[in-house]
Amino acid sequence: MKNNKNLFDLEIKKETSQNTDELEPQTAGPAIRASVKQCQKTLKATRLFTVSCKGKNGCK
């Protein structure tokens, strides 16, 4: 049973290090750029809504 537990612990450590290695090189800039590219339609609609809101209601 001790051998099985040690192998299980090693697998957890391996997965944790892999996840960390994948996430560390990324910065907020590329992630934001990618999300903007995926959501351009939503962003355009939001901008139009904001402009129309300011024009009609005088929202601050």
UniProtKB/Swiss-Prot annotation:
Lanthionine-containing peptide antibiotic (lantibiotic) active on Gram-positive bacteria. The bactericidal activity of lantibiotics is based on depolarization of energized bacterial cytoplasmic membranes, initiated by the formation of aqueous transmembrane pores. Residues 1-26 form a propeptide. This is Lantibiotic Pep5. Belongs to the type A lantibiotic family. The modification 2,3-didehydrobutyrine is found at residues 42, 46. One of its GO terms (biological process) is killing of cells of another organism. There is a cross-link at residues 50-53 (Beta-methyllanthionine (Thr-Cys)). Maturation of lantibiotics involves the enzymatic conversion of Thr, and Ser into dehydrated AA and the formation of thioether bonds with cysteine. This is followed by membrane translocation and cleavage of the modified precursor. Residues 1-29 are annotated as: Disordered. The gene is pepA. It comes from Staphylococcus epidermidis. Keywords: Antibiotic, Antimicrobial, Bacteriocin, Lantibiotic, Plasmid, Thioether bond. GO terms for molecular function: signaling receptor binding. There is a cross-link at residues 35-39, 52-59 (Lanthionine (Ser-Cys)). It comes from the Bacteria. The modification 2-oxobutanoic acid is found at residue 27.
